[in-house]
């Protein structure tokens, strides 16, 4: 069709222009490096005008602005925290900002990751973030690392920067960043945000503790919730990300009041902050003590029993006999076999979309024994042959529910419930592509 041809031509033109723009940006970057080497001891007129509102602060001044200009910061994660933190670092005039992320921009990112736009969906996050930051401030250098941080590349990448900002959303990477920063003697500005709450601290700064001082061992995988599962309000990541930039700037300037040895908690429900004193540096910490046993990076996915990515985790708690695929469940529905489908998502998620005839019993009610076998089976309990299947959004909470319910069903001599592998996301991918995904 004529419209399809026109769209294809425009998309091709955009790809060509992006390639040309990338080449020009690289040329500009090379030219800037050449001149910046000769003027690193002073501010030019453009910089004085641009940063004047912060230069006049007694805490910054000309010498402070020069410190910012000479500084280099690596932001690990170009998502909800990394976007606001890198934005304010660029605005403040940090001379070299590195952006590390392995992912591409998705529509679900845009409510909180404000460096990305509808036009950059499908691009790598690092390229999208770099383009935005350089549009904001052409006088700084922005380097990109489109890769997943691993034990093999972490030291090589981190050693190029003065300070590291942890803007990730998974436990394994937190341990990896901590250990790498300890080995390289670099401060780590760590933030997290979930639902309507956030927290912030600085590790490995001067005599303060590192992450392992406070958390020597990782939590069980099934107890960890990321924003993909638990949700997050974009304004919360904005608050914490901006504060990460503030702490980074204070470290660069050498100012007092850095959140080392303290934890800042933000409650978005009440719009309140709490400042807690943390335990000091652990004398026998495996990473940062005087005689550390950890002298090189390890396999952090193995150590934490979870993937070192911000992508949705996939638990594996049940035996194959306790699970069925979405295709198998579709066959059960088509054959009109009598069964009960339990959806363990929260009521607000259940309202978004649900499979026909499913019963909503939230996972929290199941785990806290507020609702059990009778709530699930109802009048069907007298039928020993009724099959019970459990579904959730991605197939994690449903496994927890089955593991909790199995002994209760066994006590009553009833067949064990079975988990639907991959949850509603798998249903959309493999059975009904029109079923909403979120």
Swiss-Prot record:
<dbReference type="InterPro" id="IPR036873">
    <property type="entry name" value="Rhodanese-like_dom_sf"/>
</dbReference>
<feature type="binding site">
    <location>
        <position position="288"/>
    </location>
    <ligand>
        <name>Zn(2+)</name>
    </ligand>
</feature>
<feature type="binding site">
    <location>
        <position position="125"/>
    </location>
    <ligand>
        <name>ATP</name>
    </ligand>
</feature>
<dbReference type="GO" id="GO:0005524">
    <property type="term" value="F:ATP binding"/>
</dbReference>
<comment type="function">
    <text>Plays a central role in 2-thiolation of mcm(5)S(2)U at tRNA wobble positions of cytosolic tRNA(Lys), tRNA(Glu) and tRNA(Gln). Also essential during biosynthesis of the molybdenum cofactor. Acts by mediating the C-terminal thiocarboxylation of sulfur carriers URM1 and MOCS2A. Its N-terminus first activates URM1 and MOCS2A as acyl-adenylates (-COAMP), then the persulfide sulfur on the catalytic cysteine is transferred to URM1 and MOCS2A to form thiocarboxylation (-COSH) of their C-terminus.</text>
</comment>
<dbReference type="GO" id="GO:0004792">
    <property type="term" value="F:thiosulfate-cyanide sulfurtransferase activity"/>
</dbReference>
<dbReference type="GO" id="GO:0005829">
    <property type="term" value="C:cytosol"/>
</dbReference>
<keyword id="KW-0548">Nucleotidyltransferase</keyword>
<comment type="pathway">
    <text>tRNA modification; 5-methoxycarbonylmethyl-2-thiouridine-tRNA biosynthesis.</text>
</comment>
<dbReference type="InterPro" id="IPR045886">
    <property type="entry name" value="ThiF/MoeB/HesA"/>
</dbReference>
<dbReference type="GO" id="GO:0032447">
    <property type="term" value="P:protein urmylation"/>
</dbReference>
<keyword id="KW-0808">Transferase</keyword>
<dbReference type="GO" id="GO:0006777">
    <property type="term" value="P:Mo-molybdopterin cofactor biosynthetic process"/>
</dbReference>
<feature type="binding site">
    <location>
        <begin position="169"/>
        <end position="170"/>
    </location>
    <ligand>
        <name>ATP</name>
    </ligand>
</feature>
<feature type="binding site">
    <location>
        <begin position="108"/>
        <end position="112"/>
    </location>
    <ligand>
        <name>ATP</name>
    </ligand>
</feature>
<feature type="binding site">
    <location>
        <position position="213"/>
    </location>
    <ligand>
        <name>Zn(2+)</name>
    </ligand>
</feature>
<keyword id="KW-0963">Cytoplasm</keyword>
<keyword id="KW-0547">Nucleotide-binding</keyword>
<feature type="binding site">
    <location>
        <position position="80"/>
    </location>
    <ligand>
        <name>ATP</name>
    </ligand>
</feature>
<feature type="binding site">
    <location>
        <position position="285"/>
    </location>
    <ligand>
        <name>Zn(2+)</name>
    </ligand>
</feature>
<dbReference type="GO" id="GO:0061604">
    <property type="term" value="F:molybdopterin-synthase sulfurtransferase activity"/>
</dbReference>
<feature type="binding site">
    <location>
        <position position="101"/>
    </location>
    <ligand>
        <name>ATP</name>
    </ligand>
</feature>
<keyword id="KW-0511">Multifunctional enzyme</keyword>
<dbReference type="Pfam" id="PF00581">
    <property type="entry name" value="Rhodanese"/>
</dbReference>
<dbReference type="InterPro" id="IPR028885">
    <property type="entry name" value="MOCS3/Uba4"/>
</dbReference>
<feature type="active site" description="Cysteine persulfide intermediate; for sulfurtransferase activity">
    <location>
        <position position="392"/>
    </location>
</feature>
<keyword id="KW-0067">ATP-binding</keyword>
<dbReference type="GO" id="GO:0002143">
    <property type="term" value="P:tRNA wobble position uridine thiolation"/>
</dbReference>
<dbReference type="GO" id="GO:0046872">
    <property type="term" value="F:metal ion binding"/>
</dbReference>
<keyword id="KW-0862">Zinc</keyword>
<protein>
    <recommendedName>
        <fullName>Adenylyltransferase and sulfurtransferase MOCS3</fullName>
        <ecNumber>2.7.7.80</ecNumber>
        <ecNumber>2.8.1.11</ecNumber>
    </recommendedName>
</protein>
<comment type="similarity">
    <text>In the N-terminal section; belongs to the HesA/MoeB/ThiF family. UBA4 subfamily.</text>
</comment>
<dbReference type="GO" id="GO:0042292">
    <property type="term" value="F:URM1 activating enzyme activity"/>
</dbReference>
<keyword id="KW-0501">Molybdenum cofactor biosynthesis</keyword>
<keyword id="KW-0479">Metal-binding</keyword>
<feature type="domain" description="Rhodanese">
    <location>
        <begin position="335"/>
        <end position="436"/>
    </location>
</feature>
<dbReference type="Pfam" id="PF00899">
    <property type="entry name" value="ThiF"/>
</dbReference>
<dbReference type="InterPro" id="IPR035985">
    <property type="entry name" value="Ubiquitin-activating_enz"/>
</dbReference>
<dbReference type="InterPro" id="IPR001763">
    <property type="entry name" value="Rhodanese-like_dom"/>
</dbReference>
<dbReference type="InterPro" id="IPR000594">
    <property type="entry name" value="ThiF_NAD_FAD-bd"/>
</dbReference>
<feature type="binding site">
    <location>
        <position position="210"/>
    </location>
    <ligand>
        <name>Zn(2+)</name>
    </ligand>
</feature>
<comment type="pathway">
    <text>Cofactor biosynthesis; molybdopterin biosynthesis.</text>
</comment>
